[in-house]
Amino acid sequence: MDIVSIGWAALMVVFTFSLSLVVWGRSGL
C-alpha cells in the first residue's frame, strides 16, 4: 500500500464522517 492509497482512504473516511455529521445536525439528532 503506497502513500496515495492511504491518502485517498483517509480522505474518504473524513468526507463520509463530515457528511453524516451534517445530516445528523440537520435532522436535529
From Swiss-Prot:
Major location (coarse): plastid
The record's InterPro entries line, in alphabetical order, gives:
Cytochr_b6-f_cplx_su8_sf, Cytochrome_b6-f_cplx_su8
Q: Which SUPFAM superfamilies match?
A: PetN subunit of the cytochrome b6f complex
Segments passing through the bilayer = 3-23
The topology of this chain with respect to the membrane is: Single-pass membrane protein
GO CC list = chloroplast thylakoid membrane; cytochrome b6f complex
Q: Which UniProt keywords apply?
A: Chloroplast, Electron transport, Membrane, Photosynthesis, Plastid, Thylakoid, Transmembrane, Transmembrane helix, Transport
Q: Where is the protein found, in the record's own terms?
A: Plastid, Chloroplast thylakoid membrane
According to the lineage, what is the superkingdom? Eukaryota
Q: Name one GO molecular function term.
A: electron transporter, transferring electrons within cytochrome b6/f complex of photosystem II activity
Q: Which GO terms describe its biological process?
A: cytochrome complex assembly; photosynthesis
Q: Name one Pfam family in it.
A: PetN
> What is the purpose of this protein?
Component of the cytochrome b6-f complex, which mediates electron transfer between photosystem II (PSII) and photosystem I (PSI), cyclic electron flow around PSI, and state transitions.
How does the record describe its quaternary structure?
A: The 4 large subunits of the cytochrome b6-f complex are cytochrome b6, subunit IV (17 kDa polypeptide, PetD), cytochrome f and the Rieske protein, while the 4 small subunits are PetG, PetL, PetM and PetN. The complex functions as a dimer.
The entry's family comment says: Belongs to the PetN family.
Q: What is this protein called?
A: Cytochrome b6-f complex subunit 8
- The species this protein was found in: Zygnema circumcarinatum
Q: What is the lineage of its organism?
A: Eukaryota, Viridiplantae, Streptophyta, Zygnematophyceae, Zygnematophycidae
